Amino acid sequence: MKLNIRAQTAQNQHNNSPIVLVHGLFGSLDNLGVLARDLVNDHNIIQVDMRNHGLSPRDPVMNYPAMAQDLVDTLDAQQIDKATFIGHSMGGKAVMALTALASDRIDKLVAIDIAPVDYHVRRHDEIFAAINAVSESDAQTRQQAAAIMRQHLNEEGVIQFLLKSFVDGEWRFNVPVLWDQYPHIVGWEKIPAWDHPALFIPGGNSPYVSEQYRDDLLAQFPQARAHVIAGAGHWVHAEKPDAVLRAIRRYLND
């Protein structure tokens, strides 16, 4: 599946590989914009809407092999042989899955606050309840939707993040498929070891990349290095963009 993208040309001359930015669950291509705005200085940038998100096509399947194939199809459509991939959460898993499908298309890999594991946890049921409450109402504006969502969610930052995908009274993500396929999204099928340097950027306050996942991570990414961002939660890049960009640039320049 060819994904909806936003492509930007680097502002300065360079020999760097293009960077593909891959968002997480309930997101869109805007979500890693804080990284794009810096990295476009010396890299061509592709931001993607993942399947069933934003303006990309809808499909009943939402697993990581399918998402990885979408990334290959999108590279092909842009006539890009090889790229650096930076993915957050679900997007990070999609990028990791790409190592098993088409490792020759990857220059470098960055996974932000995610590990290659099956989490076996439902962390988003309250979010689904809030989203469905808006869908069942006659809310047309983000202000109306926010009032409904506050009955289900306490974190204003999460509400505002979700509302970026509420346009003209409609959600831009495919709620029924995301609900149906949720076990695949939190899940993971182990992949063969990818024996190249990869950067993992966990948030110090996030449960997504804890010590219990270390062995699984190193079995699949034996040359992984982690740069923990102290004081950050799951949305590391939004909370501590400068620290995340420093870690990414150090890795890209090695």
UniProtKB/Swiss-Prot annotation:
Keyword list, A-Z: Hydrolase, Serine esterase
GO molecular function, one term: thiolester hydrolase activity
Enzyme class, UniProt record, top EC level: hydrolase
Active-site positions on this chain: S89, H234
Name of a matching Pfam family: Abhydrolase_6
EC number: 3.1.-.-
Record bears the keyword Hydrolase: yes
CC terms in the record's Gene Ontology section: cytosol
Function: Displays esterase activity toward palmitoyl-CoA, malonyl-CoA and pNP-butyrate.
Family membership: Belongs to the DmpD/TodF/XylF esterase family.
PANTHER family: PROTEIN ABHD11
Protein name stated in the entry: Esterase YbfF
Name of the gene this protein is made from: ybfF
